[in-house]
A protein has these predicted regions:
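Extracytosolic ligand-binding ectodomains
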Residues: 13-376
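Sec/Tat signal peptide C-region and signal peptidase I cleavage site
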Residues: 7-13
Length: 376
């Protein structure tokens, strides 16, 4: 009697779903874009390793160069591609502002992972635009109250003249005045400015306690190094836009020491999911750090994939699921979108550079009273 024939059951290949990542992969803030891309890539890799996943995911990365015109071009490219269901989009606020109408026109849901200008979500009624990170309003409220609470009284503000920089100037100035600080002068500089001798010479004469900088890492490095050359001893505090390894590398460990930055959300590296993220990120041996906003890109990609798993790769259905996001656990904490699809961020974390690394203020020697900031 012959053996019965065994028929192999074919394994059906999973449908491939494309997700776009858009950020600055080249240029002065490419470190942030590459960290964001790697983090979104990690989310996709981990999801594809999950046998319970209904779909196979592919990340389509595009470089917006942190330039609005380029951002519109690449946003149009991915949004016009119907095989791309949604996007993890933008670190630079000016780019996020320019591309919102594009995603709205094509009906492609986008989850912003780094841009902090409030109007990205609050300045429109685009149901396609969501944001997992907080806004500069939160940052500047804390930045002003914290520094006046330490005893500082006199400020000079330097900001870049993009929407990002002007927004930080607006909100920080308002909160500082409410907190009792005085502004001796405000200086707008271009985003690609190299020489700050004119501005810093005037600032040296004003003798501020603190220089507040509203801009991104490349300018912060130049300003900090040129402050030193001109003998300016003021304390430097900046926005989340300078919290990067590139700032410390560019300014050097000695000059970067004591610089302050404020970023929305709990310290992700202290959350259980953050430890998981750090371990998995290290295993992939990416050539770049995840940087401050990498975890937000990771969370954004996972929110999109969760929605696809629930309703399938349909843009409108995915958008509607994202719009109803409430108390979803992520590595950045619980995510809840308000009626403008803005994540409600409960707190701002204060960071200071100590011994060549960004350290949570409360855990630093400065926060513990063992070291003092400039002028205290």
């Amino acid at each position: 009697m012959g053996l019965p024939m065994l028929l192999a059951t074919p394994v059906m290949a999973k449908e491939v779903v494309k997700i776009a990542f858009v950020g600055p992969l080249t240029g002065g803030v490419s470190n942030m874009g590459l960290g964001g891309r790697n983090s979104a890539d990690l989310a996709v890799r981990l999801r594809n390793e999950n046998p319970k996943s209904k779909y196979s995911y592919e990340l389509v990365a595009q470089d917006d160069e942190c330039k609005p015109n380029v951002g519109v071009q690449v946003a149009t490219k991915v949004a016009a591609d119907k095989s791309v269901v949604a996007g993890v989009t933008h670190y630079c606020s000016a780019v996020a502002m320019a591309t919102g109408p594009v995603y709205n026109r094509f009906g492609m849901p986008a989850v912003v992972w780094g841009a902090v200008l409030p109007d990205v979500t609050y300045g429109n009624e685009f149901k396609e635009i969501h944001r997992v990170n907080g806004t500069m309003i939160n940052q500047n409220d804390v930045a002003a109250k914290f520094m006046t609470g330490l005893g500082y009284k006199k400020w000079v503000i330097i900001h870049d003249t993009t929407d990002y920089g002007k927004g930080h100037n607006k909100y920080f100035s308002e909160f500082l005045q409410k907190s009792g600080g005085s502004i001796l002068g405000t200086f707008g500089v271009t985003a690609d400015q190299q020489d700050f001798t004119t501005e810093l010479t005037k600032i040296r004469e004003l003798k501020p306690d603190v220089i507040f900088f509203g801009g991104l890492t490349p300018l912060a490095v130049r300003i900090r190094t040129q402050m030193d050359k001109l003998g300016i001893k003021a304390q430097l505090e900046g926005t989340s836009g300078i919290k990067s390894d590139a700032y410390i590398q560019g300014a050097g460990k000695e000059l970067a020491e004591g610089t302050l930055s404020f970023i929305e959300g709990a310290p992700w590296e202290k959350l259980p999911g953050g430890l998981f993220f750090t371990g998995k990120y290290s295993q992939q041996k990416y050539g770049e750090s995840a940087e401050a906003y990498g975890p937000f890109a990771f969370a954004a990609a996972n929110l999109i994939m969760d929605a696809v798993e629930k309703v399938g790769p349909d843009r409108k259905k995915v958008r509607d699921v994202l719009n109803k996001t409430k108390d979803v656990d992520t590595i950045i904490g619980k995510v809840t979108f308000d009626d403008h699809r803005q994540n409600i961020v409960p707190l701002i974390t204060k960071y200071v550079v100590e011994n060549g690394a960004w350290v949570v203020w409360e855990e630093s020697s400065y926060g513990k009273g063992k070291r003092k900031l400039t002028g205290l």
